[in-house]
Amino acid sequence: MLNSLDLAGRPQDTRVVVAMSGGVDSSATAALLKSQGYDVVGITLQLYDHGAATHRKGACCAGQDIHDARDVAERIGIPHYVLDYESRFRESVIDSFADSYALGETPVPCIECNRSVKFRDLLATARELGASALATGHYVSSRRLADGSRALICAADRDRDQSYFLFATTREQLDFLRFPLGDMTKPQTRDLARQFGLSVADKHDSQDICFVPTGRYTDVVERLKPNAMEPGEIVDLNGRVLGSHPGIVHFTVGQRRGLGIASRAPLYVLRLDAARRRVVVGPREALRMERIVLRDVNWIGDGALDRAVGDGLELFVRVRSTRAPQPAWLRAVKGGYEVELVAGEEGVSPGQACVFYDAAEGQARVLGGGFIKSAAPRSIAEPAHDDAASPALAAMRG
């Protein structure tokens, strides 16, 4: 007989480690599992703070969060541990964040944190503690497949769905992970936290990158990669110099404001040439890309990736966390994989993720994804499939 976490055994005989960030989501997760009788252990990762800040309420974002996690653990009566992962986090997340910006990319540090820290090191720690699962407060779901493995599923609350940030999760990790909030809405989570009397029930959600609480990510990049702050030229598609800039780190693909150049028509950042320290700008129509070259592809769909792709796999992709999935074709090419966007997409930025889904809406299954290495318009891409032959495009158009 399986318990509510789809694990064999009674809840009281099942140890579950909960990754507690100090926010309402992970706190409600811990309280819910405790109320269901599980042997819950809370762990908070100290990622970017030092010394007394971990013990002093309100010292900084990380210090406050650790204080809140401890408070919740005490309230619900579970053991709680704080693990110092600062060095690991700096090497795996912060340094790669700065490297990515220096290369002219727009990184997503939350993906790297989940991939390199939470779902690898923390998961290993949970196993060492004798846990049967690691639970988090992410808004995603998972379900058991016929072969016993687990699939990653979008959250019921579409506005809160975090599947984009978890595409790099491996099959082995999915087998051990649980997401109790996947079928809940944010208001329901807050109501649950109030029912348990948690002090964080009305705590504001974090809006910034956790290690950049001021929102000035350029400060981090300047400290670690000062060459990314070197000035350069702003040029048009023909290479004509239109102006100058204080460093490519200040720009991202699709940006319109803050260019500091006069033009009769609106200009947008089309790409960043880190080698020549150039910001290439042009009209909005030049932003539309149809072909995406991927790197570090992770596949969690059925079977082996190459067999699933074959001569081309029709699916849906999301190229930014805030955008809806759209029809696409995934193809194997020499040295990697490419995605052809059926209808094109504006502002496709290297460094962002391209996440695969089996449907455009609802609780779709996440099939994997990869990081965007480069993008190109249709004029230099492979010929697209005829729209009439694409059921995915028909589904998008309704």
Curated annotation (Swiss-Prot):
Keyword Nuclease tagged: no
EC number, UniProt record: 2.8.1.13
Pfam families in UniProt: tRNA_Me_trans, tRNA_Me_trans_C, tRNA_Me_trans_M
Gene Ontology MF terms in the entry: ATP binding; tRNA binding; tRNA-uridine 2-sulfurtransferase activity
Protein's name according to its UniProt entry: tRNA-specific 2-thiouridylase MnmA
One Gene Ontology CC term in the entry: cytoplasm
GO biological-process terms attached to the record: tRNA wobble position uridine thiolation
Catalytic activity: S-sulfanyl-L-cysteinyl-[protein] + uridine(34) in tRNA + AH2 + ATP = 2-thiouridine(34) in tRNA + L-cysteinyl-[protein] + A + AMP + diphosphate + H(+)
NCBIfam families cross-referenced by the UniProt entry: PRK00143.1, trmU
Annotated positions for site Interaction with tRNA: 138, 352
Active-site residues annotated for this sequence: 113, 210
Similarity comment text for this entry: Belongs to the MnmA/TRMU family.
Cystines in this chain: 113-210
Parts of the chain that traverse the membrane: none
Assigned keywords, A-Z: ATP-binding, Cytoplasm, Disulfide bond, Nucleotide-binding, RNA-binding, Transferase, tRNA processing, tRNA-binding
Entry function: Catalyzes the 2-thiolation of uridine at the wobble position (U34) of tRNA, leading to the formation of s(2)U34.
Cell compartments where the protein resides: Cytoplasm
Class of the enzyme per the UniProt entry, highest EC level: transferase
Region (Interaction with tRNA): 160-162
UniProt-annotated binding residues for ATP: 19-26, 45, 137
